[in-house]
Amino acid sequence: MVLEEEKDFICRLKNRDNEAYIRLYDLYFSRLYRLAVHLVYGEEEAKDIVQQLFVDLFEKPVRLEGVRHLGAWLCMAVRNRCLNYLYVQDIEDKRKMLYLEAINEADAPEWLADEEL
């Protein structure tokens, strides 16, 4: 898109122009989806991340204030959301591991008693 055309397009998005949102989705979904799949290694997770970005933009178009290059901004937004997703997954994985370790430690004396018999 030419810079002037992109400014007009962003203005239409901020004004919640439905046709502009449809065009935004058509122009960028597949590119953003491929980026997300590459980052999170999961198709469903990637799809959810990208779809949520589009929903958030529709609900709060003010996020587009100051955006000059829409494609670059969208890619950065997807990247940030993917990194956040991976961070949350890492925390959940660590929590699960700690839980399993606690269970194993709680069961350890019973196992030791069985082995001594």
Task: Give names to the regions the model predicted.
Residues L3, N84, E92-L117:
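Internal acidic/polar
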Residues K14-R23, Y33-Q52, E65:
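Short, charged helix-capping/linker segments at alpha-helix termini
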Residues F9, A20-Y21, I49, L70, ...:
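Hydrophobic side chains within well-formed alpha-helices
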Residues R34, D48-V55, E59, R68-N80:
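Structural recognition of an alpha-helix C-terminal capping motif at a helix-to-coil junction
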Residues V62-G66, M76-M97:
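Arg/Lys-rich amphipathic alpha helix in sigma70-family domain 2
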